[in-house]
Design a protein with these regions (language model features):
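Flexible gly/pro/ser-rich segments immediately N-terminal to CXXCH heme-c attachment motifs
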Residues: 39-41, 76-79, 100-107
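Electrostatic cytochrome c docking/interface patches
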Residues: 11-40
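Short microdomains enriched in Cys/His and/or Lys/Arg
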Residues: 11-18, 66-76
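Extracytoplasmic/secreted envelope proteins and their assembly/folding machinery
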Residues: 2, 60-63, 81-88, 110, ...
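Extracellular/periplasmic metallocenter environments
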Residues: 1-15, 45-46, 51
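Solvent-exposed, acidic/flexible segments
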Residues: 28, 32, 56, 77, ...
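Periplasmic/extracellular electron-transfer cofactor-ligation site
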Residues: 36-62, 69-74, 89-96, 119-121
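C-terminal capping alpha-helices of c-type cytochrome domains
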Residues: 9-20, 87, 91-121
Length: 121
């Protein structure tokens, strides 16, 4: 697994710690709300946690502040909308041996999931 080290002042680090302890923001748009339902009450919640929601899985990464990160997938990919969508659609294609289950969802549901995930900052 790769790691990136970010050097911050003590004050900036403390601000980051406080921010990371906050629950996920509430989705605002209908698309975000539909995505939240899929992520927090659907198959994603079996493995992933989103603090402040019903999603309390322990196997996969905590998604609460996903978009506060610059990389994901165990450090192999920059966190961009395109990379995350590709990961959600087929993680094994990006990272062979990925433990994320391959799920088949419609493009419409992918759009909903992505809209919600992008709110998790």
């Amino acid at each position: 697994m790769r790691f990136n080290v970010i050097v911050q002042s003590a004050a900036d680090f403390q601000t980051w710690v406080v921010d990371q302890q906050q629950p996920a923001p509430a989705p605002q748009t209908d698309l975000e709300k539909a995505g939240a339902q899929i992520v927090t009450q659907g198959i994603c919640s079996a493995c992933h946690t989103v603090d402040g929601t019903a999603a309390q899985g322990k196997i996969g990464p905590n998604l609460t502040h996903l978009y506060s990160r610059s990389i994901f997938a165990g450090g192999i990919a920059p966190l961009t909308d395109a990379n995350l969508q590709a990961w959600v659609m087929d993680s094994a294609a990006m990272k062979p041996g990925s433990l994320m289950a391959s799920v088949h969802v419609s493009q419409q549901d992918i759009d909903k999931i992505m809209a919600y995930l992008k709110t998790l900052k």
